[in-house]
UniProtKB/Swiss-Prot annotation:
CDD domains: RPS2 (cd01425). Keywords: Ribonucleoprotein, Ribosomal protein. One of its GO terms (biological process) is translation. It comes from Acinetobacter baylyi (strain ATCC 33305 / BD413 / ADP1). It comes from the Bacteria. GO terms for cellular component: cytosolic small ribosomal subunit. InterPro entries: Ribosomal_uS2, Ribosomal_uS2_bac/mit/plastid, Ribosomal_uS2_CS, Ribosomal_uS2_flav_dom_sf. This is Small ribosomal subunit protein uS2. Belongs to the universal ribosomal protein uS2 family. One of its GO terms (molecular function) is structural constituent of ribosome.
Length: 249
């Protein structure tokens, strides 16, 4: 078992098994539901444990090949956690609002990212100081607005290799765009959500802060382990290339 894998106990302690009220359920989630308690659906964690660990192993493999996973969680319960864990793992993220076309219209979005980077340079190289107060204020506001929307993807450099999504219904547009482009989706899917178009369905509570923290931190750990492996392989290869050179000398 890898260090980043999650156990049944971890999920229980985080409340990952508590679904939504039974009247809000999506019948497509039937196979993942254990039963109901006080009109709340209980998620069968016997499904969640292997599903989550499969997804973590997939993300680990991607990271070991230096690929990128885009973290997506824009609702209040997820945004801070998604941002923190994506930053810790050195991955792109969307924590504020998904802009339509963020993936499918990447070329146009890149122009906005370039504008953001240009404004950030201007704010640091003294350009803003040469402007009138009004012009400087307008550019500062534009920069802050762009940073809020695009700050998490400004260094992505191109389309991601996978999406990791908290609350697949809330992020339906992101998932649809990923599906159109053939980008795999890892999704936390609650009892009220539609699992269609999600490649790695992880049945679990998508509202509890502790549960969301568990998923996102485990994902970050898996990615960091993959990156560490890639670095160790690169170091070993570099040493192997140095050895013949040293013997020739």
């Amino acid at each position: 078992m890898a260090d980043y894998n999650v156990s049944m106990r971890d999920l229980l302690q985080a409340g990952a098994h508590f679904g939504h009220q039974t009247r809000f359920w999506n019948p497509k989630m039937r196979q993942y539901i254990f039963g109901a308690r006080n009109k709340i659906h209980i998620i069968n964690l016997e499904h969640t444990v292997p599903a989550l660990n499969d997804a973590l192993n997939f993300a680990n493999q991607l990271a070991s090949k230096k690929n990128k996973v885009l973290f997506v969680g824009t609702k209040r319960a997820a945004s801070n956690i998604i941002r923190e864990q994506a930053q810790r793992a050195g991955q792109p993220y969307v924590d504020h609002r998904w802009l339509g076309g963020m993936l499918t219209n990447w070329k146009t979005l890149r122009q906005s990212i370039n504008r953001l980077k240009d404004l950030q340079t201007q704010s640091q190289d003294g350009t803003f100081a040469k402007l009138t107060k009004r012009e400087a204020l307008e550019r500062t506001r534009e920069m802050e607005k762009l940073e809020r929307s695009l700050g998490g993807v400004k260094n992505m450099g191109g389309l991601p290799d996978a999406l990791f999504v908290i609350d697949v219904d809330h992020e339906a547009i992101a998932i649809k765009e990923a599906k159109n482009l053939g980008i795999p989706v890892i999704g936390i899917v609650d009892t009220n959500s539609n699992p269609d178009n999600v490649d790695y369905v992880i049945p679990g509570n998508d509202d509890a802060i502790r549960a969301v923290t568990l998923y996102a931190s485990a994902m970050a750990d898996a990615i960091l382990a993959g990156k560490e492996y890639a670095q160790s392989q690169a170091n070993a290869q570099a040493k192997g290339e140095e050895a013949p050179a040293a013997s020739e000398a």
